[in-house]
Amino acid sequence: MLNKKIIKPAGKVATEFENTVAQALVDLENNNAELKDLKDLSVCSVKEVDVAESKKAVVIFVPFRQLKNYNKIQQKLTYEVEKKLGGKQVMFIAQRRIIRKPASNNKIKMQKRPISRTIKAVHDAILDDLVFPNTIVGRRLRYRLDGSKLHKIYLDRKEMLSNISKVDSFSAVYHKLTGKEVVFEFTQQTAEN
């Protein structure tokens, strides 16, 4: 049953931690009536990211075509998987591939690169998957005096109470996956007349 839950490329073997997460998903699929939709869903890989000295986050990569199905049950599924993994924060991200920019000196004609496979599109999609079900309402790119960049991401204030504890995890996971430094903030409440 675990072999069907984890999809790996030929020749790759699932790690012990990936098997643990897959077993947790199988248990939830069998025991929880609300999560019966998990039967058709699978996992590509699982990574564990250090957030702070004692905090860890778990990133579960799912096939791109199954992301919408995961999103339908994601809030309940995240809560249940976090309980099974001992309180580690869980995030679901679609497995995407970046195709590099074709070199100008390449004599062989290459296939055109789709916009969805560019590095910017993939990094933006990872960001959207990371903060789901919250929505990103604004982005700012700040250039520091030393030349480094800081991305400021503004999240919707409606989901602030449920996501305020996850903001550190969001930035640590995004930095680990993309190498970009990110700060998440919630929008300011404006006075309505």
Swiss-Prot record:
The keyword GTP-binding does not apply. One of its GO terms (molecular function) is structural constituent of ribosome. One of its GO terms (cellular component) is cytosolic small ribosomal subunit. InterPro entries: Ribosomal_eS7 (IPR000554). Keywords: Ribonucleoprotein, Ribosomal protein. GO terms for biological process: ribosomal small subunit biogenesis; rRNA processing; translation. Transmembrane segments: none annotated. Pfam families: Ribosomal_S7e (PF01251). Belongs to the eukaryotic ribosomal protein eS7 family. This is Small ribosomal subunit protein eS7. It comes from Dictyostelium discoideum. The lineage of its organism: Eukaryota, Amoebozoa, Evosea, Eumycetozoa, Dictyostelia.
